[in-house]
């Protein structure tokens, strides 16, 4: 069983955008969709998209959106590699979930340790959250507790 899988096309990204919980951080926006929250009342097209994601048998699915405003290709790729490494390292803690991360400009100046602490704290907060649609963080999360 593959441990980490990425979202492949626009339809999968749109499915997560429409149905996921949101977490707002000053350097990124995190969308999280648990498999258990998927309802059978979704339209047939959305059910097919979800089934195609689920059929890839990964514990954690990850989508990354890094716009050109962030920097040149080497900077965007560096950010994507860092986020994938953090997710791959910790995917055993988060099962049957889809995370989608939309990166903001402030992430460029962030070093790997700070990025890891902020992402993991956000992952944990979202994964353990009640069913709220939007969660906001007004200050930077200082360190990962766990």
Curated annotation (Swiss-Prot):
Give the organism the record lists. Answer: Helicobacter hepaticus (strain ATCC 51449 / 3B1)
Which function does this protein serve? RNaseP catalyzes the removal of the 5'-leader sequence from pre-tRNA to produce the mature 5'-terminus. It can also cleave other RNA substrates such as 4.5S RNA. The protein component plays an auxiliary but essential role in vivo by binding to the 5'-leader sequence and broadening the substrate specificity of the ribozyme.
Position of the signal peptide: none
Q: Does the keyword Nuclease apply?
A: yes
GO cellular component, alphabetical, reads: ribonuclease P complex
**NCBIfam families found in the cross-reference section:** rnpA
> What InterPro entries does this protein map onto?
Ribosomal_Su5_D2-typ_SF, Ribsml_uS5_D2-typ_fold_subgr, RNase_P, RNase_P_CS
Pfam families in alphabetical order? Ribonuclease_P
Q: Which GO terms describe its molecular function?
A: 3'-tRNA processing endoribonuclease activity; ribonuclease P activity; tRNA binding
- Give the PANTHER family listed for this entry: RIBONUCLEASE P PROTEIN COMPONENT
Underlying gene: rnpA
Its protein name is: Ribonuclease P protein component
Q: How does it assemble?
A: Consists of a catalytic RNA component (M1 or rnpB) and a protein subunit.
Say which enzyme class the record assigns.
hydrolase
- Which EC numbers does the record give? 3.1.26.5
Q: Which family does it belong to?
A: Belongs to the RnpA family.
Hydrolase as a keyword of this entry, yes or no, is: yes
Q: Which GO terms describe its biological process?
A: tRNA 5'-leader removal
- Catalytic activity, per the record? Endonucleolytic cleavage of RNA, removing 5'-extranucleotides from tRNA precursor
Entry keywords, A to Z:
Endonuclease, Hydrolase, Nuclease, RNA-binding, tRNA processing
């Amino acid at each position: 069983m593959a441990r980490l899988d990425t979202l492949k096309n626009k339809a999968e990204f749109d499915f997560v955008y429409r149905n996921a919980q949101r977490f707002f951080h000053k350097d990124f926006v995190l969308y999280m969709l648990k498999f258990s929250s998927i309802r059978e009342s979704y339209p047939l097209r959305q059910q097919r998209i979800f089934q195609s994601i689920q059929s890839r048998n990964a514990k954690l699915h990850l989508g990354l959106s890094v716009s050109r405003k962030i920097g040149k290709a080497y900077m965007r790729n560096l950010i994507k590699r860092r986020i994938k490494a953090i997710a791959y390292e910790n995917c055993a803690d988060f099962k049957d979930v889809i995370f989608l991360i939309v990166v903001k400009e402030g992430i460029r100046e962030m070093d790997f340790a700070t990025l890891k602490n902020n992402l993991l704290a956000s992952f944990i907060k979202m994964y353990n959250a009640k069913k709220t649609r939007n969660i906001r963080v007004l200050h930077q999360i200082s360190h990962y507790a766990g």
